[in-house]
Each structure stands twice: as C-alpha cells, then as structure tokens.
A protein has these predicted regions:
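Thiamine diphosphate
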Residues: 1-136
C-alpha cells in the first residue's frame, strides 16, 4: 500500500521547517517543536518519494524535515521534449520511474528484495545504463 500526498508549496513547507529550527535554536529550554511536514510523515510507514515537474532542488529543500528515506525526482532542464509526457520520461519522473524509485527506496530500507526493483525495471523497460538526463 502507499499514500499519495499533494504538496501545494514546497517553499512554504521549507519556510515552516526553517522557522521551527530557528525557534528550537532560540528556545533550548523548551520542548522542541516539529515542522509540519515532519509531523505529517513521522508516523507513516515507508519511504517518501517526491516527483515534480520542477528541478529536484525544489523538493530537496525539505530533506532536513523528512524523517524517512527521501528520494527526489525532478525535471532538471527544459526544452528537451515537445510534450509533458516525453519531458517526464526523459527526465525520469514519469509513473514508471516513480514506481521504480519507490521500490528502490523500499529495497534500500530492507523492506523488499532488490529483485523486485529489477523486475519492475524490466517490466517498464527502464534502461539503468541510460545516460543521466541532467548530463546529456
């Protein structure tokens, strides 16, 4: 099973986390506060995968506040595709890469066998030796 969450603003979640960190630094004698995104995810099972049509760094700004294995996917470039579907495929953020990334995170955490990831890659035709789209 999995949960799908929609983030309306990575920036606002990041600001909240930074505000909480500042408050905790300035109030060492009080009970530490937790960022909103931390509160929402800390009791959830499994890794967190972020997939966005923006650059990876957009969601990476939440890494400090995600209390789980956190994998980010993003379109680190532009002008490479004539449709959104092709863009997502080229930059490895389409549904197949989201699935394989989630499975890879589960394998990394020891929750599933690595063979499950390899089988999904075969099923979806993912070439793991394809050049990194950011560098191509």
């Amino acid at each position: 099973a999995s949960d799908v969450w929609s983030v309306t603003s990575f920036n606002e979640l990041s600001r909240d986390g930074q505000h909480v960190e500042r408050w905790n630094h300035l109030h060492p004698d009080d009970k530490p506060r937790k960022a909103y995104v931390t509160q929402m995810l800390e009791e959830r099972k499994g890794p967190v995968v972020s997939s966005t049509d923006y650059i990876k760094l957009h969601s990476e700004q939440l890494r400090a506040f995600i209390p789980k294995t956190f994998m980010t996917l993003g379109t680190d470039g532009f002008g490479r595709s004539d449709t959104r579907q092709k863009l997502r495929s080229f930059f490895e953020v389409d549904r197949y890469y989201v699935t394989v990334t989630a499975l890879a995170a589960l394998a990394r955490d020891g929750d599933i066998a690595e063979e499950v990831v390899l089988e999904a890659m075969r099923k979806y035709g993912i070439d793991r030796n394809k050049p990194n789209p950011v560098l191509s």
